[in-house]
Amino acid sequence: GFQEPELPQIEYLIKCLPEYVHFKQDREDGLRPNGQYLMIMWLKNKYELCDSGRFWLSPTPDEASFGWDGRCRRVTVWVKLRDKKSERTFYYFNTHLDHRGNEARQKGAEMNVKMMQRIAGKHAVIFHSGDMNSQRGTTTEAYLQPYDNWMKSARERAVESDQRATFDGFGKSQPRWLDHIFYRHAKAVKYATLDGKD
């Protein structure tokens, strides 16, 4: 799952990763052609797309809109994929919570859980990644609670994991752990933060 790529970056990824296919949605829904997107990519020889969709994190989720006290329009994209070998299906949701609005983060997280329950149901295998703009051990940890109540954290539950920060402003900011992966009805085998520093 990708948050914030713009069209030149998306075109680069598509060119460099021809074995993958993708589903994307710009958060402005075409209002700003050069704006930021949310995107999911998957191996086309391994998975088949069964369904896909998107919703905005706002009181009007079917249209590009600002949520509560959010600074930006925020959207969640999702796909339902079928493993071609095992024929098992799963859902993948990818989101980006607001970076300023506290109410927008709280209600955005609550809406994500509500929509996952509505779209996938309570018994499906679900993976959910995103820039949550929320960190454990700080006041923003409260915005992760809706996920904790219904899902498990891959970083905390994986057999093999790490504690590397997911954000450091390209070396210009204090390291922070703002990005998270949650899952349901699956097993976390490995969690790794790929920061290009190795």
Regions found by a protein language model. Name each.
Residues G1-L13, M41, V79, Y91-T95, ...:
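Active-site beta-strand/loop signature of hydrolases that rely on acidic residues for catalysis
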Residues Q3-L7, N34, C72, N102-A109, ...:
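Solvent-exposed, acidic/flexible segments
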